[in-house]
Amino acid sequence: MYFLLSPAKSLNETDAVPVHISNYYSQPELIEHSQALMKILKSKEPIDLQELMSISDDLSQLNAKRNQEWNWSVEQPFTDSASGNLAKPAGYLFDGDVYTGLDMYAMDKESAIYVNEHLGILSGLYGVLKPLDLIQPYRLEMGTKLKNECGDNLYEFWGEEVTNTINARMVDSDDTVLINLASNEYFKSVKKKALAAEIVTPRFEDEKNGQYKVISFYAKKARGLMVKYAADNKLTNAEQLKQFNLAGYYYVDELSDDKTWVFRRDAADQ
């Protein structure tokens, strides 16, 4: 099985990455496409970014600075050394609820390698990342209407690239089921009809006032927890995910079907 997650807007640029995975770093597969997008972003002033991304003045200043500092070339790729184009592996740079659940900082080498082989992180700038791909800080959500050589938005820019990359990775790892843990905004970049896989979308519901519903904060963390569960237990097929029980969640067969798997958590376990 192969998992998909969305990235995070918040970034962890300070915590040190465990040394045991440093030999497994890689460069983003679609980096040349990232260069084309960054060329456009570098031409934007902070006020332009503020309007384009609907962000505050402080965030627009920060991301304009990030854009100008972003640098990659064949001769000087990303590195974990301050003497080069300093970068950090994606699974450790992204912060927020999903990545709190995933918690790669606490993983041993074997679990980190498992995640790297079975997880793709969708990205507005990088297309689709492996967790151990080195990347530099950025902000570019997939839904951003950034005009480019292919059209008026990032969905037109990425076209079939994201889907083709996912298909190739699934073939390489003999995966036949895609576990969609990404948001609608990001999963829209995947051409479902061209995807050579069965798609399963887990749904996480929490009890509140006697009713079960999707609560964003909890659901995001549960998405990361599900990938962590698969890595910690070295799962080999999707059916094993129905045993997912971290943080009090349990699979509800009578509410699930082939495409949507429902997991619930009672109020007492929250």
From Swiss-Prot:
| Protein family per UniProt | Belongs to the UPF0246 family.
Record lineage: Bacteria, Pseudomonadati, Pseudomonadota, Gammaproteobacteria, Moraxellales
Protein's UniProt name: UPF0246 protein Psyc_0554
Q: Which NCBIfam families match?
A: PRK02101.1-3
Q: What PANTHER family does the annotation carry?
A: PEROXIDE STRESS RESISTANCE PROTEIN YAAA, PEROXIDE STRESS RESPONSE PROTEIN YAAA
Q: Which GO terms describe its biological process?
A: response to hydroperoxide
> Known HAMAP family for this protein?
UPF0246
Pfam families per the UniProt record, alphabetical:
H2O2_YaaD
Give the UniProt entry's GO cellular component terms.
Answer: cytosol
